[in-house]
UniProtKB/Swiss-Prot annotation:
Belongs to the bacterial ribosomal protein bL35 family. It comes from Oleidesulfovibrio alaskensis (strain ATCC BAA-1058 / DSM 17464 / G20). GO terms for biological process: translation. The lineage of its organism: Bacteria, Pseudomonadati, Thermodesulfobacteriota, Desulfovibrionia, Desulfovibrionales. The keyword Ribosomal protein applies. The gene is rpmI. Keywords: Ribonucleoprotein, Ribosomal protein. This is Large ribosomal subunit protein bL35. InterPro entries: Ribosomal_bL35, Ribosomal_bL35-like, Ribosomal_bL35_sf. The keyword Glycoprotein does not apply. Pfam families: Ribosomal_L35p (PF01632). One of its GO terms (molecular function) is structural constituent of ribosome. It comes from the Bacteria. GO terms for cellular component: cytosolic large ribosomal subunit.
Length: 65
């Protein structure tokens, strides 16, 4: 049985936590930040977990994670 390739785009976007969940970055923090409140920017800077509905797809993209 050949090895399964990892989707490199997914490997760069997601990391696995100790409990096996996937961590991701939030959107809306690249540019046009002047109109966003400081509170919002601080909250967007915090990492988030991948939703349960998308976890199966991410797991398929990262077979060895």
């Amino acid at each position: 049985m050949p090895k399964i390739k990892t989707r490199r785009c997914a490997a760069k976007r997601f990391s696995v936590t100790g409990s096996g969940k996937f961590k991701r970055r939030r959107k809306n923090m690249r540019h046009i930040l002047t109109k966003k409140a400081s509170k919002r920017k601080m909250q967007l800077g915090q990492p988030a977990l991948v939703d349960k509905t998308n976890e199966k797809a991410v797991k398929r993209m990262l077979p060895y994670a």
